[in-house]
Amino acid sequence: MGNRGMEDLIPLVNRLQDAFSAIGQNADLDLPQIAVVGGQSAGKSSVLENFVGRDFLPRGSGIVTRRPLVLQLVNATTEYAEFLHCKGKKFTDFEEVRLEIEAETDRVTGTNKGISPVPINLRVYSPHVLNLTLVDLPGMTKVPVGDQPPDIEFQIRDMLMQFVTKENCLILAVSPANSDLANSDALKVAKEVDPQGQRTIGVITKLDLMDEGTDARDVLENKLLPLRRGYIGVVNRSQKDIDGKKDITAALAAERKFFLSHPSYRHLADRMGTPYLQKVLNQQLTNHIRDTLPGLRNKLQSQLLSIEKEVEEYKNFRPDDPARKTKALLQMVQQFAVDFEKRIEGSGDQIDTYELSGGARINRIFHERFPFELVKMEFDEKELRREISYAIKNIHGIRTGLFTPDLAFEATVKKQVQKLKEPSIKCVDMVVSELTATIRKCSEKLQQYPRLREEMERIVTTHIREREGRTKEQVMLLIDIELAYMNTNHEDFIGFANAQQRSNQMNKKKASGNQDEILVIRKGWLTINNIGIMKGGSKEYWFVLTAENLSWYKDDEEKEKKYMLSVDNLKLRDVEKGFMSSKHIFALFNTEQRNVYKDYRQLELACETQEEVDSWKASFLRAGVYPERVGDKEKASETEENGSDSFMHSMDPQLERQVETIRNLVDSYMAIVNKTVRDLMPKTIMHLMINNTKEFIFSELLANLYSCGDQNTLMEESAEQAQRRDEMLRMYHALKEALSIIGDINTTTVSTPMPPPVDDSWLQVQSVPTGRRSPTSSPTPQRRAPAVPPARPGSRGPAPGPPPAGSALGGAPPVPSRPGASPDPFGPPPQVPSRPNRAPPGVPSQPIGSGKSIPS
């Protein structure tokens, strides 16, 4: 491989794999690895057991591998195995390894043949292995067998995709030679996720089970059905061999003998078999790790940056420091106070861009919700006139009055002012609710100290409740002050002299019409909900609201006006959301029981959020469109019953004139009261509740916490937080160490280019059968070459393969005694398994004694 650093690459990734698997970050990091993919009977498990030289994988009928097995092979002087979930325990008996795999599988999936994507990490140390990391995945199947779930095919496919879709995962596609290779499940999956073939390595098993007269020579030479990284053939133990306890050492010797003696494969013998496959995978994985090092390093750096800020507070953590808890308590209280102030004042460093929070929500209560609640409690026009007429008549008593009595004005105003108490109390309740939510939000940073968080929330919430009572008393006092004295000398009050004059002016204005430019109150998108039902769905229009009318256009350019609706006699009502609707709806209707728009009694308008609805309602209030009150229908029926009174009132011109005068006076005075209440309510709540709570947190919260009792109990750390801190610190140090190692290796290695692309269109056509010799015209960029061929297109430097003796004239090259005798596959020239031998086709079949040795 060129240097020692490259040899350390696979152990490095193994260490990363263990470290990040332990803290649940493996999927995010996407470490380089080899995923073994194939059908249920393709021979995947046998290939892995041949690598290790031991029987250690579960066997049986149906689906046996039900969880991914991350198999980490480490070259060492002693032979043993370790599981990540059994840290510190060494397994020297590989039968125990098999039982532990089965037990660990059942612990997660149960015993009902279910599957799980949670991997089992197994590390095998042995002098007979090369450094390698593979992931054994469940075999693909089409039909459920026994008690397998009906959708087992899709479950397994989903699990495979979780691994093979990662760019850093090499795919070991295992296919049996005795079935149609063009229909191989493994190659189909590989083609789907790796269309360029840059990550796929082909393995052909069961070469000894092919029909007589057939072979896979052209496939192994990468002429038929070529892959970019080529194919390697292996011969595994048969079921009879397994039942007969034939050991893997003998099986490897038999495999070697098979390739040396078979006339179709003997010229490829040095590039076939399990030992050679292991070497190639070691080289391919090493090269792949080196190629992915820059991307891996970038990911590690980004993860390190993302946790560095959080780890900063843990770095200097000293659990045995006696002053630690006191310092932490002071810091937590100070942080809580600062967060609360920032959330209320709106200068927080973490600004929510999705919804209103903290002070912004309280601001909306003050300036949208509270005015809306005030107007909801305002008088109904017809009802008010009827009350005024009764008040005037009752004040005059038996006499017929000549003048408009001011007592009627005072009685009516007091009744209207009294109604302001309910929305004022509701405003306080809404602010208390928002303050409590803000306290909970601010205390989220205290989750590492659950007792402290609980106690702090309790103390502050109790204080808010105390201030709530005081604030409500003050609010009631404000309303009572308004009731105590009617200031008819107020500069904004029109007075008796101007009341009639104003009434006349209003009548003239209505008669002449407003010719001046009308002030626009609001513009925005609204969906007309009910009209679109008959026309294929609701539609969105651009609405423009003024004091006189409501218009809507096709778009916000306001060129194509769809309709204009007068706001006179309009009212608002809420509409319940539909079963499948996510929009919030309100409706406009006419108080005189007329159609609002064409044949529709009401116009339903929809918004995306409740905040938008509230904002539109507040805008309609400014235009004089008030919400419907609960008792409107009953009052309407009462008005109909008392219709004779109304007619009688209207028949008396003097009474009608007096009612109009009082009506104008009440309207003028209530406007003053409303303005005063709307101005003083936020100020009262701010002073008595919000600012007071802020001062309490800054000055008294710490003293209250100290008086609660034992500070050690208060500052007990949650088990989850302690575990999280340990995990974050472990991850932080693992990331730093990994970056250090990667940095050293990346600067001392030489890049090896990828094998050239091949014609893999056969994976899409899937019409060529395997198992038969292909004609020499099979689509491939490679052909058999003479003994000393010139450099071919696509070659890169000296060709790998057998020793130079293979180029001797006339005779066949001597077959190396074992795969290890071939040139070092980790040398500078790339080892491309798909390249055929340069030896002449005719190879004598005399036995070679040196081919009997077994790789150690």
Swiss-Prot record:
Posttranslational mods: Phosphorylation at Ser-774 by GSK3B/GSK3-beta leads to inactivation of receptor-mediated endocytosis in non-neuronal cells. Dephosphorylation at Ser-774, through the EGFR downstream signaling, leads to activation and regulates early stages of clathrin-mediated endocytosis (CME).
Pfam families: Dynamin_M, Dynamin_N, GED, PH
Modified residues (3'-nitrotyrosine): 125
Modification type Omega-N-methylarginine: residues: 796
Top-level taxonomic group: Eukaryota
Amino acid composition bias (Polar residues), ranges on this chain: 763-781
Residue ranges of the region described as G1 motif: 38-45
Annotated region described as G4 motif, given as residue ranges: 205-208
EC number: 3.6.5.5
Entry keywords, A to Z: Cell membrane, Cell projection, Coated pit, Cytoplasmic vesicle, Endocytosis, GTP-binding, Hydrolase, Membrane, Methylation, Microtubule, Motor protein, Nitration, Nucleotide-binding, Phosphoprotein, Synapse
Residue numbers carrying Phosphoserine: 306, 347, 512, 774, 778, 822
Subcellular location: Cell membrane; Membrane, Clathrin-coated pit; Cytoplasmic vesicle; Presynapse
Region G2 motif, residue ranges: 64-66
Residue sites binding GDP per the record: 41, 43-46, 59-60, 206, 208, 211, 236-237, 239
Record-annotated Dynamin-type G domain positions: 28-294
Biased composition (Pro residues): 825-844
Region (G3 motif): 136-139
Alphabetized GO MF terms: GTP binding; GTPase activity; microtubule binding
Family to which this protein belongs: Belongs to the TRAFAC class dynamin-like GTPase superfamily. Dynamin/Fzo/YdjA family.
Quaternary structure annotation from Swiss-Prot or TrEMBL: Homodimer; homodimerization is mediated by the dynamin-type G domain which promotes assembly-stimulated GTPase activity. Homo-tetramer formed from two dimers in the absence of lipid. Oligomerizes into a helical polymer that self-assembles around the vesicle membrane, when associated to the menbrane through lipid binding.
Function statement: Catalyzes the hydrolysis of GTP and utilizes this energy to mediate vesicle scission and participates in many forms of endocytosis, such as clathrin-mediated endocytosis or synaptic vesicle endocytosis as well as rapid endocytosis (RE). Associates to the membrane, through lipid binding, and self-assembles into rings and stacks of interconnected rings through oligomerization to form a helical polymer around the vesicle membrane leading to constriction of invaginated coated pits around their necks.
Domain statement: The dynamin-type G mediates homodimerization and plays a role in self-assembly. The C-terminal proline-rich domain (PRD) mediates interaction with SH3-binding partners. Is required for DNM1 self-assembly.
Stated name of the protein: Dynamin-1
